[in-house]
Amino acid sequence: MIETKRIYTTQNVYDALQDRLRFIFEEFDNIYLSFSGGKDSGLLLNLTLDFQKKYFPNKKIGVFHQDFEAQYTVTTEYIERTFQKIEHDVEPYWVCLPMATRTALSSYEMFWYPWDDTMQSAWVRPMPNHPYVINLEHNPIATYRYRMHQEDLAKQFSRWYRSSHEFKKTVCLLGIRADESLQRYSGILNKKYGYNDICWISKQFKDVWCASPIYDWSLSDVWHANYKFGYDYNRLYDLYYMAGLKPDQMRVASPFNDYAKDSLHLYRVIDPEIWAKLVGRVQGANFGAIYGRTKAMGYRNLTLPAGHTWESYTKFLLSTLPARLRNNYIKKFKTSMEFWHTVGGGLEESAIEELIAHGYNIRRNGISNYTIMKHSRIIFVGKIPDHTDDIKSTKDIPSWKRMCICILKNDH
């Protein structure tokens, strides 16, 4: 088991970033930055360009933007402003290729396809018109496959970038911060594919790496730096603030994915013209806007149809789905069951004691690597419970009810 712990230093995050950027510029031949239009990648872009102009003026970096078609108008305006400002100082790549992007809104569509050439009349917004836009009519990425997954497209871009720059050692800079989520914290601290024992650089392919040089920045650090240096940023965050969203709800992402669906209704208020096009673009958009922010599918208040257990109702719902989607759920559920039967999830002692008190057949299986607090791993012995409504201290335990809600929320 790999032990990880946070080590605090007297160096502030800005100075640490300067040291990391110097290492990157001295260590790697080819550097490009992935710019999403969000606060983190936007800040990293500005800080990196300031550093490059001051210390490495002859080393031009690339800027990669993966465009998902459906977004707020203010986001498009910010991205346009940014590229207009930097296009002569960087190698710009604005990618608008058809790609498979997950949607959490439809029971019958696992993916939707930004910039789908067969749906051009329904596009949410026009294709950007710049010489550096990469689309089906202008696509130098030889390893691109039509409608490939968005993650694969980003990876293939990095592979192509290396090959188009003399096959030299290449790094992609990412605006990822560890305090955004435990998953990101764990990912950044994954040393298995690290670069020379540096936890914030990880390997993609041969001579292609990803670096997260602001991984230890906090949310307040990001906004303080924007204010201190007077950087431009996506004004969507101002609109989110005025709409009453909490900082962890303010995401610049595809409006149809899991992270953004709960705030989908804001499109109707903030950007009604785009909203009208969203409804016609992806099945379930209107439903998601109505129900995504309610408790219509809340865990505690969902009741079973008469004559069903949660297990039988889950299996009934699975039988109504298209084969491809049904198989995807079955695979996901089997993986979850195997995890809880053989590995176990980390739970607080209060939750463990409550499970034992209520007669659940569980046992300990060491310490969890997925929790910072080093909670005990708990395995469920025998059948997965039908529901765990009697357990009040946690919802993060397996049950057929939880799987049922997963289907009802289109969480595939």
Predicted regions mapped to residue ranges:
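The Walker A (P-loop) glycine that initiates the GxxxxGKT/S ATP-binding motif of P-loop NTPases
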Residues: 35
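Nucleotide-activated chemistry modules centered on ATP-dependent adenylation/adenylyltransferase
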Residues: 1-32, 41-412
